[in-house]
Each structure stands twice: as C-alpha cells, then as structure tokens.
From Swiss-Prot:
Gene3D superfamilies: Immunoglobulins
Annotated source species: Salmonella typhimurium (strain LT2 / SGSC1412 / ATCC 700720)
Subcellular location: Periplasm
Protein name: Chaperone protein FimC
Residues spanning the signal sequence: 1-23
C-alpha cells in the first residue's frame, strides 16, 4: 500500500568479533497517517512499546515533501525513552505561517526507535545495532473545504492521453489510489495532490473502465470504485 508506513534501517554501531543483530521491533505508531485540522492548536500521535524487556530511545521530527526537516512544526517530546510495555503520546504543534486554506498540505512524520544496549552483553563482540525509522504522512487540513474526504475520490476524472492514463483531482484532498486497473491491466499505486493532474504510462492493451480503491483517514481501503475512461 502506497500509504503504509515506510521503514528504513540505519546501522548505528559496530564493535569487535562475533556478530549479533538487534532490531527495534517493539515500537508501533497508533496511526498510519496524521490528520491535523488547521484550526487546531495541536494534534497527537500515540506510540506504544509492546516489548516486555526492551527499552528504546525514540526520536521524532517532521519533514516537508522534499525530505527537509520542517522547523515550522514542534514535536514534543522530540526525544524520550520508551519503557517496556508502555504507551506515550507525541504532541504535534504547527507554529508557522498560515498554510493554503483551499486545500490540504502534505508533510511527513518521522519516528526513529533505537534499542537500548547492555554493554555487559556485548563486550568483546561485534554488534550491529539497527534502528527502525517509521515515516507516515501528515496532512494539514483546512476547515470548511467544499467536499468531504469520503466524497473526494468520486470526483476524480480519468482520460487517455496517448499511451498514458491522465488522472485529474479537482478536490481539496491528497488522494492515495491503490489496486488500480484499466480493464484487466494493473497499474502502480499513486498519490495525487489536490487540484492537480498526473499521467501514468498505460500497459500495452489496456482497455475498458478504470477500477481503483483509495486509502481513507484511518489507513483503511475504501470499496472498489469503477469510473469510465473518458
């Protein structure tokens, strides 16, 4: 799924002889995306540690769509220790200039979990310690948009431009489309920005209606929708 959590592995520490590997598998986010109402002073994201023994150092920050750290957001606490079998809440505060009021704005929430190290267990060993980076979408959503997020996928327009499928999104929402097909031909998942269009190469022999699903605010797939190819 295009909008599932992106996970990256970072090599943090290498020591001496035999090899052990540790991974931060106990940390989980409470959502696959964050919706931040623009009129709200803040929003939140739950983080849980399901591990019965492991502690993790958790570092959180927000990036813009270009992958640069976004200084207009404050995440508190930006750095904390997650104890075994515990839950914590990150507060996310936007402190920048007003964002566009006629459409959503996209950012990326990053949460890196680094497992603790017992030095007595690794002395004289070669240890490869892995951190897990969870990266999910953060949408800043203005109030009083003309459509609901549930209705937005029904407004999409599809047309053929040469050997490409053109998708037009007139709505105010970012839309993630998955399980796309033209007739019997499958097409890669895409995300299309508000009030924009994009073109996707069509597989050879693609004919017929367009069928797709979208991802809702809770990270779940909507029912399949079929649209004519204009």
């Amino acid at each position: 799924m295009l909008n599932s959590i992106k996970v990256g592995f970072i090599v943090l520490l290498t020591l001496f002889t035999s090899l052990n590997v540790q991974a931060a598998g106990g940390i989980a986010l409470g959502a696959t995306r964050v919706i931040y109402p623009s009129a709200a002073k803040q929003t939140s994201l739950a983080i849980s540690n399901s591990d019965t023994q492991e502690r993790y150092l958790v570092n959180s920050w927000i990036e813009n769509n270009a992958g640069q750290k976004e200084k207009t957001f404050i995440v508190t606490p930006p750095l904390f220790v997650s104890e075994p079998k515990s839950e914590n809440t990150l507060r996310i505060i936007y402190a920048g200039q007003p964002l566009p009021g006629d459409r959503e704005s996209l950012f990326w929430m990053n949460v890196k979990a680094i497992p603790s190290v017992d030095k007595s267990h690794i002395e004289g060993k070669n240890v490869l310690q892995l951190a897990i980076l969870s990266r999910i979408k953060l949408f800043v959503r203005p109030a009083n948009l003309p459509q609901t997020p549930e209705d937005a996928p029904t407004l999409l327009k599809f047309s053929r431009v040469g050997n490409h499928l053109k998708i037009t999104n007139p709505s105010a929402y970012y839309l993630t489309l998955v399980n796309i097909s033209v007739g019997a031909k499958k097409i890669d998942n895409v995300m299309i920005a508000p009030k924009s269009d994009m073109q996707i190469p069509l597989p050879t022999g693609a004919q017929g209606n367009v069928t797709f699903q979208s991802v809702n605010d809770y990270g779940a797939l909507t029912s399949a929708t079929t649209a004519s190819l204009g």
